[in-house]
Regions:
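Conserved functional hotspots at enzyme active or ligand-binding sites that engage polyanionic ligands
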Residues: 1-119
Length: 119
């Protein structure tokens, strides 16, 4: 673990994060997350907007799920859950994993628009 309070975080970065305790179907615990916040916010804010990743293949037909795969430093095939976006303090980010490429982030942005009804 290292101090992520002062590192430059970019949209598309993947980290392990401690999402702590949650309620019901919310994603919790230490898990990979994908940064979806814009880089201006990432530069100046003490918080960061993320979407959790999961390796559990459930309800894959949802338009808010994006297959990431076993790439970008991830050790298992992973899916971004864009219906589970949340803001976390950047100190919850534990370890840098990698950075998603542009085609993946384009699919993430499209799923985010669906999730937020911005289409």
């Amino acid at each position: 673990m290292y101090n992520t309070s002062f590192i430059q975080i970019q949209k598309g970065d993947i980290f392990y994060a401690d999402l702590g305790e949650t309620v019901g179907s919310e994603q919790n615990g230490i898990r990979p997350v994908l940064v979806i916040q814009n880089d201006v916010g990432n530069k100046y804010s003490p918080t960061v907007i993320i979407t959790p990743l999961t390796s559990k293949a459930k309800k894959l037909a949802q338009p808010t799920h994006v297959f990431i795969g076993k790439r970008f430093g991830l050790t298992e095939n992973s899916y971004a859950l864009l219906e589970q976006i949340r803001t976390i303090d950047r100190t919850r980010l534990l370890e840098y994993v990698g950075h998603a490429d542009i085609p993946v982030m384009d699919r993430v942005d499209a799923a985010l628009r669906v999730s937020l009804n911005l289409i």
